[in-house]
Amino acid sequence: MSTLRLLISDSYDPWFNLAVEECIFRQMPATQRVLFLWRNADTVVIGRAQNPWKECNTRRMEEDNVRLARRSSGGGAVFHDLGNTCFTFMAGKPEYDKTISTSIVLNALNALGVSAEASGRNDLVVKTAEGDRKVSGSAYRETKDRGFHHGTLLLNSDLSRLANYLNPDKKKLAAKGITSVRSRVTNLTELLPGITHEQVCEAITEAFFAHYGERVEAEIISPDKTPDLPNFAETFARQSSWEWNFGQAPAFSHLLDERFTWGGVELHFDVEKGHITRAQVFTDSLNPAPLEALAGRLQGCLYRADMLQQECEALLVDFPEQEKELRELSAWIAGAVR
């Protein structure tokens, strides 16, 4: 019986694919070596410990129907579209070794005619006339008895969209001598015009088989039926939930301020696990009562635009004469936290 397992997803849903990954990882035998190949439609994928409001332009994502997905590994935020091929290698310990999976991907690229090399801990780069350019980024997860290495390969991703949805740390970029996110990366189509997702998957699969000296039939994961994986429904529900994707953000504070015709408003929020734990309101409005009431109502509220709007509009019952001000305030707060 083969020690290998190969799974290929036909779904473009990031929550579905990450749930498949999680289920396989949890239930795989320690002696198995797994390769999972997949890709996502328009999505920003953030690391397990990241704050989406800090890392992403969540308002723009909502306007453009770009999903947010939190993965279970660490690392930074990345934009996925169908021009990305995603791979996940899994193995039990002590055999799990990310240098093996990295070499498999490098061998696959080499077979396609691309000479790439590992750079730092997470990246694969190619040499271009403009210097080294990243074509792959990775992240890792380990438990007591197993580990996985997952990453992306840029085939023909729309790189102009990266800046639309990601807010890179400018200090970090400056420290590395990088002027923009776009200048760091390149698509494999620049080196191999016409390269397809299917060709890349085939090359990685063949390199995987060659490394282990075994072959196995691929299991196709269809989006049209629930995968036969233990606890998939529960895992998918968690992976697609607001509580996981947004609510798992580390504690943070948010200061909002705006001047309206009727006065200036400053809101201070402390947020933990996606809930407002403290709300303070400062204003020079001649009628501060509704704003003071709002501060009380927002304590414990989900840090979500629709919930904040709901709390603002609930004040119309007690302060009907301030309807204009409260509706302006509601629209502003909702826009500011999207």
Curated annotation (Swiss-Prot):
GO terms for biological process: protein modification process. Gene3D superfamilies: Bira Bifunctional Protein, Domain 2 (3.30.930.10), CO dehydrogenase flavoprotein, C-terminal domain (3.30.390.50). Keywords: ATP-binding, Cytoplasm, Ligase, Nucleotide-binding. Pathway: Protein modification; protein lipoylation via exogenous pathway; protein N(6)-(lipoyl)lysine from lipoate: step 1/2; Protein modification; protein lipoylation via exogenous pathway; protein N(6)-(lipoyl)lysine from lipoate: step 2/2. Residues 29-216 form the BPL/LPL catalytic domain. Its EC number is 6.3.1.20. It is found in: Cytoplasm. (R)-lipoate binds at K134. One of its GO terms (molecular function) is lipoyltransferase activity. It is an enzyme of class 6 (ligase). It catalyses: L-lysyl-[lipoyl-carrier protein] + (R)-lipoate + ATP = N(6)-[(R)-lipoyl]-L-lysyl-[lipoyl-carrier protein] + AMP + diphosphate + H(+). GO terms for cellular component: cytosol. ATP binds at R71, G76, A77, V78, F79, K134. It comes from the Bacteria. Catalyzes both the ATP-dependent activation of exogenously supplied lipoate to lipoyl-AMP and the transfer of the activated lipoyl onto the lipoyl domains of lipoate-dependent enzymes. Monomer. Belongs to the LplA family. In the transfer reaction, the free carboxyl group of lipoic acid is attached via an amide linkage to the epsilon-amino group of a specific lysine residue of lipoyl domains of lipoate-dependent enzymes. PANTHER family: LIPOATE-PROTEIN LIGASE (PTHR12561), LIPOYLTRANSFERASE 1, MITOCHONDRIAL (PTHR12561:SF3). This is Lipoate-protein ligase A. It comes from Escherichia coli O1:K1 / APEC. The gene is lplA.
